[in-house]
């Protein structure tokens, strides 16, 4: 497959403004009223129309980045970014054969074969040193899966890339890995799409960093900003955790004490957060 091109000019295309601009840091909070958006599988999505989640991921892409989109599916994100002139080149990595073939088709139909290399590979193995990647996006997977991809593919990381991660749950173990590997969380977003809550975590490897257990659980910027959407999410989670705790107490079989203590601790943290 072709390597990512550095020399040939980009095909001319219309620049499209990024939708839903803004990011969640300690100083800027996006509008919380994001409910009612239909999910990716319910839309006719393509390289022209991204889901809200992918639009928000796109908003955090450094200008002129050389992107590795891991688990690229149909390749919509890198193709859309290249059409907008937002990135210089990309690698679209996909381990599953059918999405890999779909991504190749999307790239070919847009005439971007010289600028987007579609590779059938597992995780970060899609990245080669000559790609000189400056940004990595991993979206739509569980946080633990994203963590495992990063951990198993550390040899492919230069440490200079921006990580733009959109986990479907499991944010705590992902943040734990980022902290242990000296990645600072630069900003976070929370959005609601198709009735579900999703987070976006943007991180860069800067040096040692320390987060409290609560910050790893809730997100350091999320805790500080306390947006209505964030508080609504954890109000709902509190009810679910309390129900789990009650069910564990009524369980016929013995439940590991560590499991009960973990849920009880989470209930306490959420209660204190909402107090």
Map each language-model feature to its residues.
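Class I S-adenosyl-L-methionine
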Residues: 46-50, 144-275
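Conserved class I S-adenosyl-L-methionine
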Residues: 64-73
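Conserved SAM-binding loop of SAM-dependent methyltransferases across substrates and taxa
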Residues: 74-87
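Conserved SAM-binding motif I beta-strand of class I
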Residues: 89-94
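Short alpha-helix immediately C-terminal to the canonical SAM-binding loop
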Residues: 97-101
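Short SAM/SAH-binding signature in class I
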Residues: 132-140
């Amino acid at each position: 497959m072709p390597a990512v091109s550095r020399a040939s000019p980009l095909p001319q295309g219309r620049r499209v403004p990024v939708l839903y601009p803004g990011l969640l840091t300690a100083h800027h909070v996006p509008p919380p009223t994001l409910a009612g958006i239909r999910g990716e599988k319910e839309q006719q999505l393509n390289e022209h129309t991204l889901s809200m989640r992918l639009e928000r991921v796109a908003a955090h892409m450094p200008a002129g980045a050389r992107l590795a989109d891991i688990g690229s599916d149909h390749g919509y994100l890198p193709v859309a970014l290249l059409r907008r002139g937002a990135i210089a080149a990309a690698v679209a990595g996909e381990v599953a054969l059918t999405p890999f073939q779909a991504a190749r088709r999307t790239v070919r139909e847009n005439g971007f074969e010289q600028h987007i290399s579609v590779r059938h590979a597992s995780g970060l193995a899609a990245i080669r040193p000559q790609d000189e990647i400056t940004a990595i996006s991993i979206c739509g997977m569980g946080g633990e899966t994203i963590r495992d991809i990063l951990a198993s593919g550390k040899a492919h990381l230069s440490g200079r890339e921006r990580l733009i991660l959109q986990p479907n749950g499991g944010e705590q173990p992902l943040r734990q890995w980022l902290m242990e590997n000296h990645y600072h969380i630069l900003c976070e977003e929370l959005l609601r799409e198709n009735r579900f809550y999703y987070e976006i975590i943007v991180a860069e490897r800067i040096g040692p960093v320390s987060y409290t257990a609560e910050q790893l659980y809730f997100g350091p910027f999320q805790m500080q900003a306390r947006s209505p959407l964030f508080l609504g999410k954890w109000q709902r989670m509190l009810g679910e955790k309390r129900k789990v705790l009650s069910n564990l107490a009524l369980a016929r079989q013995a439940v590991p004490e560590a499991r009960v203590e973990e849920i009880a601790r989470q209930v306490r943290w959420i209660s204190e957060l909402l107090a």
